[in-house]
Curated annotation (Swiss-Prot):
Phosphoserine PTM sites in chain numbering: S17
Gene Ontology terms for molecular function: sucrose transmembrane transporter activity; symporter activity
Parts of the chain on the Extracellular side: 54-67, 122-138, 202-223, 298-323, 380-402, 465-468
Location of the region described as Disordered in the Swiss-Prot/TrEMBL record: 1-25
Pfam family, one: MFS_2
Compositionally biased spans, kind Basic and acidic residues: 1-13
Protein name: Sucrose transport protein SUC7
Annotated keywords: Cell membrane, Membrane, Phosphoprotein, Sugar transport, Symport, Transmembrane, Transmembrane helix, Transport
Gene3D superfamilies hit by this protein: MFS general substrate transporter like domains
First-listed, main subcellular location of the protein, grouped into a coarse class: membrane
Gene name per UniProt: SUC7
Length: 491
């Protein structure tokens, strides 16, 4: 979920780069670009994870209400793995450097997870799963294991990559901004490539060996996408780790290694936190309660509600479902393009609107309206199928409406990935609190709501007929409330 992780890594950057290895000066820009390019490989995999894996696990027989529990690994690893990797990366004395061992380990874990996910159906079949059975339990277990390893691996990769850029910048503010700008650029490249691959329905023809007795066309496409993902990641990682030196670190007598561990600082900060920061945490938490149901089930909504397919139906229904999934991946690609363009204009728009809190409040209204409009698009699609028949594809207008919602949601998503972190920095500066600590506390307001949604959205959807709309409506309400709170109580 790297869009989800992208700005949480700022906590890691601040923490890790603060104890950089002594360098003669900033490294050449070409070396920073080489390290930043790893983000393209990371985001390619995240894009596939966000667009294809929730539908795929349902094709393996998991009921609609359960995939959200598998997604729990995202916030859990964001809460535990990412700070832990940062902590130990700061203190790594390996002769290969502080960052390279963690980056290499993360890339290898991604490769392992991709094999487990892509070949889950094949491994499950060889272990006794019956192809004609609706639930392939062994494949589901292997898939879930690979899914969790993938989340852990991505969190192992991202923090050290950003910290490596901080080390290479050697404290130069302009170089640091430039390095992070390149990292964001390659994230956008990876997103677009990943969603484009996910939207292409005939990718398996390039890798014909991916289609097997246990692995149908959708499975073979997924497998092919992940082959491209791991190839890209391994190539850019090997080039960066070979080309860019990571000097061995030796702890100094006056280093901060013996200070309170980061988690202890975080929990201690809640005791002394002032009202402006509490208000920021409330708005952020509501914002992520609004976002997470859609991020979990957006492509499933396209396949299930808009296209009228069924992951557990006959071949025709599964084909409809798969068509919707691929169109949903196209929508996510449009979302990423709008997000990237919007990110470039945030500062200017914020000034014209009179401040960050007004901009955040305004785009949360857009978020609420777009989530509510999924109900209208769904009803129009259902009405069309009642008239034209249950196997009828959605009209061009319905499809365009759904894709427009995906694209428009790139606007509030860009704000969600930037404004909360900027406000946390401003509040921490004005109150005298450490920026690293404030961003760490903000991270808690992101991952805890994600865990709550992961536990709750599946059962809520099941309670109202196993569709996606109940979770989206809850998200729309949370977005509206967060908008009101942003306008009225944020400093």
């Amino acid at each position: 979920m790297s869009d989800l992780q992208a700005n949480k890594d700022e906590t890691t950057v601040d923490r890790q780069s603060s104890s950089s290895v002594d360098l003669d000066g900033p490294s050449p820009l070409r070396k920073m670009i080489s390290v930043a390019s790893i983000a393209a490989g990371i985001q390619f995999g995240w894009a596939l994870q966000l667009s294809l894996l929730t539908p795929y696990v349902q094709l393996l027989g998991v009921p609609h209400k359960w995939p959200s529990f598998i997604w729990l690994c995202g916030p859990v690893s964001g809460l535990l793995v990412q700070p832990s990797v940062g902590y130990f990366s700061d203190r790594c004395t390996s002769r290969f450097g502080r960052r390279r061992p963690f980056i290499a380990t993360g890339a290898l874990l991604v490769a392992v997870s991709v094999v487990l996910i892509g070949y889950a159906a094949d491994f499950g079949h060889s272990m006794g799963d019956k192809i004609d059975k609706p639930v392939k339990m062994r494949a589901v277990v292997i898939f879930a294991l690979g899914f969790w390893i993938l989340d852990v691996a991505n969190n192992t990769l991202q923090g050290p990559c950003r910290a490596f850029l901080g080390d290479l910048a050697a404290g130069d503010a302009q170089k640091t901004r430039t390095a992070n700008a390149f990292f964001s650029f390659f994230m956008a490249v990876g997103n677009v490539l990943g969603y484009a691959a996910g939207s292409y329905t005939n990718l398996y023809k390039i890798f014909p060996f991916t289609m097997t007795k246990a692995c149908d066309i959708y499975c073979a496409n997924l497998k092919s996408c992940f082959f491209l993902s791991i190839t890209l990641l391994l190539v850019v990682t090997i080039i960066a780790l070979w080309y860019v030196e990571d000097k061995q670190w030796s702890p100094k007598a006056d280093s901060d290694n013996e200070k309170t561990p980061f988690f202890g600082e975080i929990f201690g900060a809640f005791k002394v936190m002032k009202r402006p920061m509490w208000m920021l945490l409330i708005v952020t938490a509501l914002n992520w309660i609004a976002w997470f149901p859609f991020l979990l089930y957006d492509t499933d909504w396209m396949g299930r509600e808009v296209y009228g397919g069924d992951s557990k139906g006959d071949d025709k229904m599964k084909k409809l479902y798969n068509q919707g999934i691929h169109v949903g991946a196209l929508g996510l690609m449009l979302n990423s393009i709008v997000l990237g363009v919007m990110s470039l204009g945030i500062e200017g728009i914020s000034r014209k609107m009179g401040g960050a809190k007004r901009l955040w409040g305004a785009v949360n209204i857009i978020l609420a309206v777009c989530l509510a409009m999924t109900v209208l698009v769904t009803k129009k699609a259902e009405e069309h199928r009642r008239i034209a028949g249950p196997m009828a594809l959605p009209t061009d207008g319905i499809r365009a409406g759904a894709l427009t919602l995906f694209a428009l949601l790139g606007i509030p998503l860009a704000i969600t990935f930037s404004i909360p972190f900027a406000l946390a920095s401003i509040i921490s500066s004005s109150s005298g609190a450490g920026q690293r600590l404030s961003l760490g506390v903000l991270n808690m307001a992101i991952v805890i709501p994600q865990m709550i949604v992961s536990f709750g959205v599946g059962p809520i959807d099941a309670l109202f007929g196993d569709g996606n709309l109940p979770g989206f409506v809850v998200g729309a309400i949370a977005a509206a409330v967060s908008s009101i709170v942003a306008f009225t109580v944020l400093p």
